[in-house]
Design a protein with these regions (language model features):
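Short acidic, glycine/serine/threonine-rich loops at helix termini
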Residues: 67-71, 119-124
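General beta-strand structural signal in soluble alpha/beta enzymes
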Residues: 45-46, 109-110, 145
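Extreme N-terminal starter segment of soluble prokaryotic enzymes
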Residues: 1-5
């Protein structure tokens, strides 16, 4: 178990708790208390003077699809491509996954760009994981559609 001690906690409801401890087990918050006594096998992080929050969720991004090394966000062979899947285009070795995780983003919805009226499906992923299977939460989660300026100019 991971025990984060003495942090200033901020809940998603905006509640602040100073000098609180958080226990994390199997990647999930197990308990939040004023004092958690770690066991001999536990990993302890002293978060004194630091903020501790739940992992952030990015509900719409192009991580691993559109980055400095490539542009796989839009399929420009036609305006309607519901059959395309973001999961098939994502570069899971993209360094931006690590940067997102370092910033506290633990979950992302990765999808195509707005160059098509119908551009394909999003995938829900974790930003951490040693293998692809550890990262994938849902391969097809939402269908990207765009109206207005973006598909008009593409």
């Amino acid at each position: 178990m991971l025990v984060i001690k003495n942090g200033t906690l901020i809940s998603m409801a905006g509640i602040y708790k100073e000098k609180y401890d958080v226990a994390v087990e199997n990647g999930k918050i197990a308990k939040v208390e004023k004092e958690i006594v770690p066991g001999p096998e536990d990993t302890v992080i002293d978060a004194a003077g630091n903020l501790v929050t739940p992992g952030f969720i990015e509900p719409h991004c192009h991580l691993g699809i559109i980055d400095a090394d490539g542009q796989d966000g839009n399929e420009m062979t036609g305006p309607i491509h519901p059959e395309l899947r973001a999961i098939d285009a994502i570069d899971f070795h993209c360094s931006l996954f690590d940067r997102a995780l370092e910033a506290g983003v633990t979950t992302v919805a990765v999808g195509p760009g707005s160059g098509n009226i119908m551009g394909g499906t999003f995938a829900y992923l974790k930003t951490a994981g040693a293998t692809l299977n550890e990262r994938i939460m849902k391969e097809e989660a939402a269908l990207k559609m765009a109206l207005g300026e973006n598909p008009k100019v593409s």
